[in-house]
């Protein structure tokens, strides 16, 4: 399903843990790290596609996560011609993505890279939110930066929510959080 401009609709997923570290998956048999992502099927909403991709690539179900936010607009990247199949050249330019920021409410052991018959990742790790992007394929870096910048504000909102809801009634002291968010 490619639009008139040559972009395939897609979702990207930034999954973070309670320490605001983000999930990075290592592509099978490659040295490239990336966030989970995948195409939107005909008749699917971006949210439905996100939950399907999350289960296929990371093994997480809707009950394992909470949606913190999503990008307002499509973010696009062009795929270099040598990365596309010959039969798609001329029709396919790249991907347009809606990005979701999710909070893992489950546990690390809920992550399963073998949830589908064709795994995308063979390793995963948690990294700081603003990790350098050298390990990301170069043509995706700008979209990653834009998605991280737009969605970062939801982390601060979520931290305020967590702080407000972890105090006991009548307690006046701040809950100690030693999270360091980079600007």
UniProtKB/Swiss-Prot annotation:
Domain Nudix hydrolase, residue spans: 6-149
Keyword Hydrolase attributed = yes
Could you tell me which PROSITE patterns the record lists for this protein?
Answer: NUDIX, NUDIX_BOX
| Residue ranges annotated as motif Nudix box | 38-59
Q: What cofactor is this protein dependent on?
A: a divalent metal cation
Q: Which GO terms describe its molecular function?
A: pyrophosphatase activity
From which domain of life does this come? Bacteria
Q: Which Gene3D superfamilies match?
A: Nucleoside Triphosphate Pyrophosphohydrolase
Top EC class, one word: hydrolase
Q: Which Pfam family, an example, fits this chain? A: NUDIX
Keywords noted in UniProt: Hydrolase
Q: What is its EC number?
A: 3.6.1.-
Task: Describe the family membership recorded for this protein in Swiss-Prot or TrEMBL.
Answer: Belongs to the Nudix hydrolase family. RppH subfamily.
Q: What does this protein do?
A: Accelerates the degradation of transcripts by removing pyrophosphate from the 5'-end of triphosphorylated RNA, leading to a more labile monophosphorylated state that can stimulate subsequent ribonuclease cleavage.
Q: Which PANTHER family match?
A: ADP-RIBOSE PYROPHOSPHATASE, DIHYDRONEOPTERIN TRIPHOSPHATE DIPHOSPHATASE
The name this protein goes by in its record:
RNA pyrophosphohydrolase
Q: Which organism is it from?
A: Thiobacillus denitrificans (strain ATCC 25259 / T1)
Q: Which gene encodes it?
A: rppH
């Amino acid at each position: 399903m490619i639009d008139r401009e040559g972009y395939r609709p897609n979702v990207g997923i930034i999954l973070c843990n309670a320490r605001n570290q983000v999930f990075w998956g290592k592509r099978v048999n490659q040295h490239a790290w990336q966030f989970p992502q995948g195409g939107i099927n005909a008749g699917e909403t971006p949210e439905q596609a996100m939950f399907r991709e999350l289960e296929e690539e990371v093994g997480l179900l809707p009950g394992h996560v909470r949606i913190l936010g999503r990008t307002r607009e499509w973010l696009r990247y062009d795929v270099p011609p040598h990365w596309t199949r010959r039969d798609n050249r001329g029709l396919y330019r790249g991907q347009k993505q809606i990005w979701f920021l999710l909070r893992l409410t489950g546990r690390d052991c809920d992550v399963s890279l073998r949830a589908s018959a064709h795994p995308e990742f063979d390793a995963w790790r948690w990294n700081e939110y603003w990790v350098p992007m050298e390990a990301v394929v170069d043509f995706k870096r700008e979209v990653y930066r834009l998605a991280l910048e737009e969605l970062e504000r939801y982390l601060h909102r979520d931290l305020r929510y967590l702080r407000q809801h972890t105090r006991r009634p009548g307690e006046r002291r701040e809950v100690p959080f030693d999270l360091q968010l980079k600007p």
